[in-house]
Structures are given as structure tokens and as C-alpha cells.
Design a protein with these regions (language model features):
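The feature primarily captures lumenal catalytic ectodomains
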Residues: 1-234
């Protein structure tokens, strides 16, 4: 939702074939895959983290379509409908089929930091997997096109807030979504995508965790609260 809408806006006035280079931070594999659909190869990109100064005859800079003013993460609530529709129309045909389960638990334990990690991960996992039939998926282990299929195939998705929820773009209408995040976190992008795609979205906000207790994560979700929300939702 960060880079692709800007490219779409730019292409409305400047055909992609006429653009020589894309100047952006180092690309993750899923970003390279998404750009390949638009015929933008890795050789066309310049790593802005490595090359801090560049010179060009013509430079095109695009402001994100959801941004108006203030803190960028708070602005995602203004995500335009056309962005989601364009992403669906462009990328859903490339979904890569694999043996994916309908009940998806987004697993962030492979993350390098403790932001939006469950302190009681094992307790939550045991309940969701053993008693409700969820299956864990680490999105870093999937290709971009497999992520598209995973989300489009799912009936219910549960997880702590993360950039992985951007893939709600590809969900079918009425897919159930349970997102857990700290009460102080203002990013409402998942809710906005759910509104546009007509998803059945539920947010669980957790109390702030003391700084000296965040070494294992900044989310503590009491099991009884999870059980209550799951039973009322499924």
C-alpha cells in the first residue's frame, strides 16, 4: 500500500515503459515480485539507502494518496477505495495456489523485534490451534503470490497487528478478521481495508505493557478475553 499506489498514479501521466529508474529503499523479495507484474525489473531500481544522492534530467515524486497531513500512520484511515480495487484487479489473477487452510493464524515469532508480539504466544497458539483448528503461517516464508492466495482462500484470519494485514486487500467479502494491537497504536489501515472489501472485522485492543516488561513482546492478551471474542465471532 506504500509504493504500488504511487506507481499507479505516476503511470496515469507517465507510462512505465518511459521511466528509466525507480528510486526506493532496498526492496524485499515480495516487493520485487509485485513490481515484476508491472514490468519493473530489479535492474530498474536504485537503492536509496545505498545511493543517498542522485542526479536526473527529470525527477517524478508522488505523495501517497491517503496522506493529507500529520502522522503518516494515522492517515491510512483515508485510504482511497480505488487503491484497493486496483490492487485486487491487478494482482488476484497471479495468486499461487497451494494447500492453505481456511483458519489462518498470522505468526510473527520470526520477527527481529518485539513490536506487536504476544507475550503469551504459546498460550494463545495452543488455544487457537488445538481447540479451534487454526494453522500458523509466517508470511516471510511465503512468496507474494502465495500470500495473495492465502488471504483470498481464508475464512477467518487472526493475528497481532503487522504489515502482513495489508494483504487483507485480497480477501473475499465477508472474511472474518480479528486483529490484536496495543491501545496506543493508531494505525487503522486494517479497518479501512475491511470497510472497502466488506470484511467482517473485529479489533481487540490490549492494555499498554510497561517498558521494562516488553522484552518478550508489547501485547498481552488474556486467554479469557481471547476465548470470549472467538466464541462470539466464529
Amino acid at each position: 500500500l506504500e509504493m504500488l499506489p504511487k506507481i499507479k498514479m505516476c503511470s496515469e501521466n507517465y507510462p512505465i515503459k518511459d521511466i528509466n529508474y525507480l528510486y526506493a529503499p532496498k526492496l524485499a523479495d515480495f516487493q520485487k515480485e509485485s513490481l515484476s507484474v508491472l514490468n519493473i525489473s530489479e535492474s530498474m531500481t536504485i537503492n536509496s539507502e545505498k545511493y543517498r544522492h542522485i542526479e536526473a534530467d527529470e525527477l517524478l515524486a508522488v505523495v501517497h494518496p491517503s496522506y493529507h497531513k500529520g502522522y503518516i500512520l494515522e492517515q491510512f484511515k483515508f485510504q482511497p477505495t480505488w487503491v484497493i480495487k486496483w490492487l485486487r484487479n491487478t494482482y488476484l489473477p497471479y495468486a499461487k495456489n497451494f494447500k492453505a487452510h481456511k483458519k489462518v493464524f498470522l505468526d510473527r515469532t520470526d520477527s527481529l523485534n518485539t513490536h506487536c508480539q504476544f507475550q503469551n504466544e504459546k498460550e494463545i497458539s495452543d488455544y487457537l490451534i488445538k481447540e479451534n483448528g487454526f494453522v500458523k503461517y509466517q508470511l516471510t516464508k511465503l512468496s507474494f503470490f502465495e500470500k495473495i492466495f492465502l488471504f483470498n482462500n481464508a475464512e477467518i484470519i487472526f493475528g497481532a497487528h503487522s504489515s502482513g494485514f495489508m494483504n487483507l486487500v485480497f480477501c473475499k467479502p465477508h472474511t472474518k478478521v480479528i486483529e490484536v494491537k496495543p491501545v496506543f497504536h493508531t494505525n487503522a489501515v486494517s479497518k479501512r481495508i475491511s470497510e472497502i472489501n466488506d470484511l467482517n472485522y473485529q479489533l481487540i485492543e490490549t492494555k499498554a505493557v510497561e517498558e521494562n516488561k516488553k522484552n518478550s513482546g508489547d501485547i498481552f492478551l488474556p486467554l479469557n478475553e481471547l476465548i470470549k471474542n472467538i466464541k462470539n465471532f466464529i
